[in-house]
Amino acid sequence: MEILSKLFGSPTRVKLMRFFLFNPDKIYSSKEAASRAHALPRETEKELRIFEKVGFIKRRGIIETELTTRRNKKPLVRRRKTVGWTLDRLFPYLLPLKNLIINTTLIDHREMVRRLARAGSLKLVIAAGVFIQEEESRLDLLIVGDHLKKTVIGRVVKAMESEIGKELRYVILETSEFKYRASICDKLIRDVTDYPHQKLLDKLEQEKEE
């Protein structure tokens, strides 16, 4: 991420590029793009104008819904037309840009483990899917440990999603449940371990050897 930020000018630009590359068929308002990238609205709008100018994205009209809660009354629903943005598949450098942006290490693996460790006693962390450029994988992250705080992991994952530009598919399991599922050849576990994946942390294997 740091190298790409230097090449492309800012972390926000890289996050927004990934956001559109990972979601090529969706249309987003500048407000939603800013929210998902955890970026300032003004900065986001500036980047979107640059993207449009070079032909990376194109405008599309969308209907935006706003819900306003009112005391002792039904919520007020407002719908308005606004400008949305979507990836322009005719962008001439789409493939090489995608290879560069997506195939570059998304988040340092040691940093990922360090962040997730805030949630409790980690035993196993497996990366698949988006982290190893395997789009067909069932999961992106399998997190195993003892007394894990799911709310903490949820916050960490949300932060990673904003950096990567894609919603992550992940599962959290207590060690005992993981061992049981593995012993009965559970489909979820096999869908991860029988296909390309990368172990970022494996204390379970270390414990076997001791």
Please give the residue ranges for each predicted region.
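Regulatory nucleotide-sensing modules
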Residues: 125-129
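Short, solvent-exposed beta-strand edge segments and adjacent coil->beta transition regions
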Residues: 138-140
